[in-house]
């Protein structure tokens, strides 16, 4: 008979999916980098007006956030430049005219 207590329940991290240029990406790292620098970014946008490391999607305490990494041209949301915003279902962000959408559902 085993008297050891069961291991603690650790809930799975929420799933986040990103849509860009007709492709769907699964965000499965705590910090997903978006930018133009190959080899340093998870999503590479080949545009000279996109910073080398432009923005990050970060998982913090069970919630996802998009964070501007000090880029020159910023991250847009609903016509405004943002530094950081919690991502909610259906959010769309602009990075120098490139639209990036987010969903917690994978159709």
Feature names for model-found ranges:
Residues 70, 76-107:
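C-terminal boundary/linker segments immediately following FHA domains
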Residues 34, 53-57, 62-67, 71-75, ...:
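Short hydrophobic/aromatic patches on the structural cores and recognition surfaces of FHA
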